[in-house]
Regions:
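Helix-rich terminal scaffold detector
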Residues: 3-7, 167-294, 298-304, 315
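Short, glycine/charged-enriched hinge/interface segments at domain edges or termini
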Residues: 2-8, 13, 18, 23-25, ...
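A short glycine/serine-rich beta->alpha loop
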Residues: 43-45, 77-82, 295
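Alpha-helical scaffold segments in soluble metabolic enzymes
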Residues: 9, 13-16, 30, 34, ...
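An N-cap/entry alpha-helix motif that binds or orients negatively charged groups
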Residues: 16-52
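Short, conserved secondary-structure segments in the cores of folded domains
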Residues: 36, 48-49, 73, 83, ...
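Flexible glycine/proline-rich
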Residues: 24-29, 38, 51, 80, ...
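Short, basic and Ser/Thr-rich N-terminal targeting/leader segments
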Residues: 34-36, 42, 52-55, 89, ...
Length: 402
């Protein structure tokens, strides 16, 4: 097992261990936030017929060449109706937005360009050929790929798929994640801590991060600092695709997670990463399942989850690019660095008048300052090679995905 490896290498090792989960079929209305397991192709042309883009009149170009043009209005077509007749030369047909256009229509003149009274239309402006006509198949052709596999289903995608008659989609099932917080000092959130005890923040916090990342929590467990308790927690994780531990992977005599996992045959890839916060981070594979050992400090655990576990779950869901979105930003104030350690600084972000993303420290940067997770917009990545991070320095900014 390697120790104190670089952040970039550690993250790639985690991603390389991801196994894409299987598919399941869900109703369209339940697919928001899920990931497509297969491409979706259009069953029809969209729109399915030539339609009017405006309220107005269907006309032939030769009839409106000389202005003002005066034409009899011989019919009206509303959305949902079928034109009863062809547009004959020398006539106009009133059409509403979305209405099918009668055969013979060469353009639509919007209502703002003319007036109609007692069945006669006067046009003071002529449309160009095809103007204000939405052609059949203009948006999508039958058989055309609408959304590729690996796409996250958004509300906008739901509307598009509904318009194509898609009522059920194949999505990746949610990766099953077991979250285990460790420590004799932990009590439940509904309990009053006794002397030397604290409420468990890691279990509920990490479970929420799993859900926000598209996973399904199959257990939120607390393991005491005994081999028997850690063993019992591991035995309860058999259904999980991914195991996430908070605490128990450091060098203390009661950090028993590593020992118990090794007894069960885990293959460790690394232990300790050259980063801050989250230096005591461990990763391995047990029976083909990724095992991520996070620090016990809640801030360090939350940060490491976003940097490592969220991309891992995205890869398990089959996302083409599982890495979190990042962008360039500029520091408005100096930030502390640590020699040889990649630093994740909690920062606020705002754009100035010129469009530059300005980053400022979100208060104290200690790994015990849980409030900084709420007060910040994301993480500024300060490379391990930097001796200092001065105001004005350009850095990579990773916005919180929650």
């Amino acid at each position: 097992m390697r120790t104190l490896i670089a952040f970039e290498e550690a993250r790639q090792i985690v991603l390389d261990a991801a196994r894409v989960v299987g598919p399941e079929a869900v109703r369209l209305g339940d697919a928001v936030g899920r990931t497509l397991a297969a491409p979706v192709t259009s069953r029809d042309d969209l729109p399915p017929f030539d339609t009017s883009a405006m309220d107005g009149w269907a006309v032939r170009l030769g009839d409106v060449r000389d202005l003002p043009a005066v034409l009899p209005v011989v019919a009206t077509v509303h959305a949902g109706e079928v034109p009863a007749a062809t547009l004959a030369p020398g006539t106009a047909i009133a059409v509403m937005t979305g209405a099918p256009l009668p055969s013979g229509t060469e353009a639509v003149a919007p209502v703002e360009w003319g007036t109609a009274s007692e069945g006669r239309l006067r046009l003071d402006r002529a449309p160009e050929a095809g103007q204000f006509i939405r052609r059949r198949g203009e948006a999508l052709r039958e058989g055309e790929e609408v959304l590729p596999s690996g796409t996250a289903v958004t509300p906008g995608a739901i509307g598009l798929l509904a318009s194509l008659g898609v009522h059920e989609v194949a999505v990746r099932r949610r990766p099953r994640v077991a979250v285990v917080a460790t420590g004799d000092e932990l009590v439940g959130v509904d309990e009053a801590p006794g002397p030397g005890q604290i409420r468990d923040a890691n279990g509920p916090g990490l479970a929420a991060q799993v859900a926000a990342a598209g996973g399904a929590v199959v257990g939120t467990l607390v393991a005491r600092d005994t081999s028997a308790s850690v063993s019992a927690a591991l035995a309860a994780c058999t259904e999980a695709d991914v195991l996430v531990f908070a605490g128990g992977v450091s060098m203390g005599e009661r950090d028993l997670v590593r020992t118990e996992l090794e007894r069960r045959g885990v293959t460790w890839s690394f232990w300790k990463v050259a980063q801050r916060p989250g230096k005591p981070l461990a990763f391995g594979v047990l029976d083909g399942r990724p095992v991520l050992g996070l620090p016990g400090n809640p801030v360090s655990a939350a940060v490491c989850f976003e940097v490592y576990a969220r991309p891992l779950l995205s890869a398990c869901l089959g996302h083409a690019d599982p890495l979190p979105h990042s962008e360039a930003g500029r520091l408005d104030a100096a930030l502390p660095t640590a020699a040889g350690l990649h630093t994740f600084a909690r920062v606020t972000a705002r754009r100035d008048e010129s469009g530059v993303l300005r980053l400022r420290p979100a208060g104290a940067q200690g790994s015990h300052v849980a409030r900084s997770l709420l007060d910040s917009d994301g993480l500024a990545h300060l490379p391990a090679s930097w001796d200092a991070a001065e105001a004005g320095a350009e850095v990579t900014f990773q916005r919180w995905a929650w």
